[in-house]
Amino acid sequence: MIYQSPTIQVELLEDNIARLCFNAAGSVNKLDRETIDSLNAALDAIKQDTNIQGLVLTSGKGAFIVGADITEFLGLFAQEESVLLPWIAEANVVFNKIEDLPFPTISAINGFALGGGFETVLATDFRIADTTAKLGLPETKLGLIPGFGGTVRLPRLIGADNALEWITTGKDHKPEAALKVGAIDAVVAPENLEASAIAMLKEALSEKLDWQARRAKKQAPLNLPKLEAMMSFATAKGMVFKVAGKHYPAPMTAISVIEQAARSERADALMVEHQAFIKLAKTDVAQALIGIFLNDQLVKGKAKKAGKLAKNVDSAAVLGAGIMGGGIAYQSASKGTPIVMKDIAQPALDLGLGEASKLLAAQIKRGRSTPEKMAKVLNNITATLDYAPVKDVDVVVEAVVEHPKVKSMVLAEVEQNVSDDAIITSNTSTISINLLAKSLKKPERFCGMHFFNPVHKMPLVEVIRGENSSEETIASVVAYASKMGKTPIVVNDCPGFFVNRVLFPYFAGFSGLLADGADFAAIDKVMEKQFGWPMGPAYLLDVVGIDTGHHAQAVMAEGFPDRMGKDGKDAIDIMFDSERFGQKNNKGFYAYSVDRRGKPKKDLDPTSYELLGAEFGDLKAFESDEIIARTMIPMIIETVRCLEEGIIATPAEADMGLVFGLGFPPFRGGVFRYIDTMGVANFVALADKYAHLGGLYQVTDAMRELAANNGSYYQA
């Protein structure tokens, strides 16, 4: 053994070839500080052993290296730039050591080699991957750029255009695609990986492969004529800005870094990368996106833990077909859980099956599925008008019309037609789970399972715990949601649960602005372009359905009369009373027509302005800051109330719920990350400025206390 640590082992094989094996104690290899330090020491030991003539990097895990240890990032990035720059420079010395060894090197890549893992293999002269490999640089998804030489080595290896696409999109790539552009040198079967790597290394040792020329190319300026470079980088900037926009600076920074370093050799090129990496690491966007990644890991960890308490869900049923039922059936069946879709009307079943077929056909059109897979998924969906096929299922999802009496009747009926240990859930968006549980003999085997529309696109599922729901019930539904490919968060029962409860104060803030004469289109523009929502409040109401919003608003007003009760008509009432229900009947705040692609196209409609003007008077202009404050403060305070009341367990789960359930701008990280970034005291001061507008704008005592103590919701 040449070197051994808890994360790395180095031993000498035949023919004086050394094998460096990444093999950490956990389930995966990560490039944490300990591993980088071990790699540094291992390379020193390798360099000192004069017998070694070649080096192969391998992994003792099912994945090569999944990337850097992101759990270290937030604490690390909180330090000053003067501390971070030497840190990243020192880390890069380690990768340079790989590249500077006096003999040829190769990486044998299995499974994931992402981020720092991929940058590690870029430092070797050759790369060979097995058929399970996934390679890529996903740092831009975290608001960063590669920091261990990725922006320097990859363009010199695969060309500027290919490298720009790899780095700015942050996508991972299959080995065949990586081979095509030259990121790796061969693809082999997993059982042949190490032997093939050693064989290639021997070809380099016998000078059949010119490893020194390979190495020199990676360390030299980019081989790109000046005019071609100008065109490449200008085109890339235009295309990337169109996708990334002004709120996500990392992809544009990556282009600038590659462009600036194009004429430089390794040392100067790496310095350009270091400085840009550190600047991005200090941005609020990076903090927010890293926070989302960590929150996602926390939620997934909770779901995994729940799986240990859960009963097996091998079959399911959805009651109520149509678009929602069809979407739930598609999601369950496509992820491997057979599902019965029951309705009382054949046309509804046809609609549900049609929805599933449409979604599957779209997958085939995009090249993500095949007709054979489509047939298999459809065979996993059993459409029925009676309860016979439902009797042995493990979980039932009730998804009938949003009416308490109808739901209660259907729930009581299905309980008579399933096994004693079946779990029953309701896909209600507003009706109390405790109220619905009264219709059941076994309320302990009942909870809410709130999907968001469209089911196949929206990642969130709210699992709503009623006062009688058992831990096994909750755990089983969480596990089933995870199995469906969804992100489940557990919330306690209250009007609107979590997501709708915090959404409607936002709509109330919007309605208040309209009552004071604001233009709904101007509000939408500010909330989309400046704050970053995918849709402004008027457009969102049109898409959700103003009739749906009107009903939910009434539920919220009844549940929280002090804060959400209304004195008179608001904008939602006006639209509803005029039967302007949004996209569903082509008129809401906006008018809708169908474009050439068959998609709804929105236009301003004078009728909307006439209706609102008759109630609220002439339009007035509002500053962007006031529009943002008056819409967002109520949502933020209500979110904090949900945490304080125990409706949601942690800031992390709240923020994931908002990002995945409502489309809260990811670059802001969620409500709690947003407050922490602003500073709790600054937020309290801003809310106090608008406190005269009513209870929705009045912060809680606990918030004031946190502000006074200079506290935050997330701990660094």
Swiss-Prot record:
Pfam families: 3HCDH, 3HCDH_N, ECH_1. Substrate binds at residues 296, 500. Keywords: Fatty acid metabolism, Isomerase, Lipid degradation, Lipid metabolism, Lyase, Multifunctional enzyme, NAD, Oxidoreductase. The keyword Hydrolase does not apply. It comes from the Bacteria. Residues 311-716 are annotated as: 3-hydroxyacyl-CoA dehydrogenase. GO terms for molecular function: 3-hydroxybutyryl-CoA epimerase activity; delta(3)-delta(2)-enoyl-CoA isomerase activity; enoyl-CoA hydratase activity; long-chain-3-hydroxyacyl-CoA dehydrogenase activity; NAD+ binding. The keyword Cell membrane does not apply. The active site is at residue 450. One of its GO terms (biological process) is fatty acid beta-oxidation. Pathway: Lipid metabolism; fatty acid beta-oxidation. HAMAP family: FadB (MF_01621). NCBIfam families: FadB (TIGR02437), PRK11730.1 (NF008727). Involved in the aerobic and anaerobic degradation of long-chain fatty acids via beta-oxidation cycle. Catalyzes the formation of 3-oxoacyl-CoA from enoyl-CoA via L-3-hydroxyacyl-CoA. It can also use D-3-hydroxyacyl-CoA and cis-3-enoyl-CoA as substrate. This is Fatty acid oxidation complex subunit alpha. It comes from Shewanella woodyi (strain ATCC 51908 / MS32). The gene is fadB.
